[in-house]
Amino acid sequence: MKKKIRQILLTLLLFVFSILIISIPTQAAKPAATTVKSKTSYSNSKESMTVRGLDAKKKVVWKYVTKKYTATELPRTKCIVRKDKVYVFESSKIVVLRKKDGKQLWTAKKISPAGHLCKFDKNDNLYITGYYDNNVYKVSTKGKILWKTNTSKANNYWPYKINISGNQMTILYEMNDNDDSSEKTHKIVFNIKNGKILKYS
C-alpha cells in the first residue's frame, strides 16, 4: 500500500514538473551586431569616442564609450574592426571587444598615445606605432606586448605606412632629421619575430 502511494506521488510530481517546464517562456536570443559604427566627439578641449554595434535592422545591440582625453593636434582615439573583433584605441591603450555583443576581451596598455598607425599580420598579431612615437610595438591576439623596439637611431619621424612581407615589416616615414627632403623615401625594416631593426634609411 505504501509502495503504491509513493508511486502515485512520484507520478504526480513528475507531471507537475513537466507542466512547469512547458509553461516557462523561452527567452529569445539577443540579436548579434553585424556592423560597427564609431563617432569621435570634442567638447571643452576633450576628445572621446562612442562605438556602437548594430544588428541587421540597424538597432543598437551594444555601446562602448571611451574616457575623455585632452585633445591634441593628433587624434587620440581610433576604431578598427578586424573579423569578429573591434579594436578601440584610446590614448595609450587598446580595448578589444567582441563584435557580436560588445564583450570586452582584453586590454593592452602603454602603447603609442596618439596618431596611431597599425597593421595586422596573417596571424592577427598587431603592430603599432604613433605619429610622434619612437617606439614600435607588437601585440598578440591575447593582448600581450610581444616586443617593443625603439627606433631613435634611424632619426626618422612621421610614419605613414606599414607593409608586411613574410617575416619582415617595413615602416615608411615622411621625414628624417639628417635629410629634410620630402622626396626621398625614409624607412625602417624590422624582423617581425623579435622586433630587431634589420636596416634603415
For each predicted feature, which ranges?
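Sec-dependent signal peptide cleavage junction
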Residues: I19-A33
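Repeated scaffold domains used in trafficking and secretory/extracellular systems
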Residues: A71-V81, S112-D121, A154-I164
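Bacterial N-terminal signal peptides that target proteins for export
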Residues: K2-L12
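Aromatic (tryptophan-biased) beta-strands that constitute blades/sheets of beta-rich domains
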Residues: S38, G53-T70, Q104-K109, S140, ...
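Conserved blade-register residue in beta-propeller folds
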Residues: V51-G53, V96, V136-K138, K187-V189
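Short coil/turn segments that connect the beta-strands within blades of beta-propeller domains
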Residues: K83-D84, N123-D124, N167
